[in-house]
């Protein structure tokens, strides 16, 4: 491999119909990938995708701070999602981490950029800090 993309999300809903093909295109272009989970479901999906490839596909598992509280998010352009509140379940993530190609645990730290207008920002910050 010539390159490695250290932060992909081919495990998300936008790629549900072509995740394997998307990963294969990267591999064909000599790009290894680390596919990053943002909550338990997408972390499971990142790990499940590993079994479809022999090498050069890895996973990081974790809980993104924007999933520590329930909300709808839209950036006005292309990103739009609805999320439920989730707490970091150490046992569940520990189990996923047993796969030999899980190379990281954690998403990206605290995220105060995507705070909903209609929620108490301090309350959300407390929820995020508690998860990490």
Each language-model region and where it sits:
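Mid-domain alpha/beta scaffold segments of enzyme catalytic cores
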Residues: 1-132
């Amino acid at each position: 491999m010539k390159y490695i993309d250290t932060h992909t999300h081919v495990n998300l809903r936008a790629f549900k119909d072509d995740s394997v093909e998307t990963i294969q295109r990267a591999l064909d272009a000599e790009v290894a990938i680390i596919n990053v989970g943002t909550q338990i479901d997408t972390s499971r999906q990142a790990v499940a995708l590993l079994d479809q490839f022999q090498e050069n596909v890895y996973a990081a598992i974790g809980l993104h701070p924007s999933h520590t509280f329930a909300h709808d998010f839209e950036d006005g352009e292309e990103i739009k999602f609805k999320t439920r509140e989730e707490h970091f379940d150490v046992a569940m993530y520990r189990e996923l981490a047993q796969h030999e190609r899980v190379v990281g645990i954690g998403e990206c730290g605290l995220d105060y950029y995507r705070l909903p207008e209609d929620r108490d920002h301090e309350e959300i910050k407390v929820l995020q800090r508690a998860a990490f």
